[in-house]
Design a protein with these regions (language model features):
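Long, charge-rich boundary regions
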Residues: 163-196
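Iron-sulfur-associated redox domains of electron-transfer enzymes in respiratory
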Residues: 1-161, 170-171, 176
Length: 196
């Protein structure tokens, strides 16, 4: 599924995600299919209110049209994320979250779960895909989706069949779990992943 809608994660999930994190910059997608008003979708303010109620410092926020457009998003975010920002939180479908995670120098988290709504599609401007599984794993995996990027859709780690960083099913494809581990290691988050 390339085009999805999204809902804010439950208050309990958000509180768990925010535990131990502060100095948050919030990025929200302005949505690519606003004419379809069949579901209520969250924006920056929905998440920001929850974070501030937990005493979290918001370093800033921005809404971006077509957040999944990496070139445009990179230009928009350049120089916009304030110094001192420790985490980026994205209010978007999985496509936007993956795009921001690829660009951000700090850990990126999603405040939403993506849902599949048949017939209500936006205009994804990326080769990335979102499974719209309604239980987003991107917070645990550094913004790399194990459902769509792993040929076996494994959610609890590598299968052990990868060779030289390539998938055993599709040798032209990088192993998603090796990429996940490398990103988490770069962000100093491997222990956090192992304790989930």
């Amino acid at each position: 599924m390339d085009y999805t809608k999204y809902v804010l994660k439950s208050q309990e999930e958000l509180e768990g995600m925010l535990a131990g994190k502060d100095n948050l910059f919030v990025v929200a997608c302005n949505k690519c299919f606003k004419e379809f008003e069949t579901t209520q979708e969250p924006d920056c303010g929905c998440f920001t209110a929850i974070a501030e109620a937990q005493g979290k410092h918001i370093t800033g926020s921005v809404k971006v049209d077509f957040l999944c457009n990496k070139v445009q998003t990179e230009k928009t975010l350049a120089g916009l994320v304030p110094e001192g920002t420790e985490n980026v939180v994205v209010v978007s479908c999985g496509l936007g979250v993956q795009t921001v995670a690829d660009l951000a120098a700090v850990p990126t988290f999603t405040a939403t779960n993506s849902l599949n709504y048949v017939g209500h599609h936006g205009m994804a401007l990326t080769k990335k895909t979102c499974g719209a599984c309604a239980q987003c794993y991107l917070n645990a995996t550094g913004g790399i989706c194990p459902i769509v990027d792993c040929s076996k859709s494994l959610v609890n780690g590598q299968c052990g069949g990868a060779k030289n960083g390539k998938c055993e099913i599709d040798p032209k494809k990088d192993c998603a779990w090796e990429k996940i581990y490398q990103r988490l290691e770069k962000q100093g988050r491997t222990k956090e992943f192992l304790h989930q």
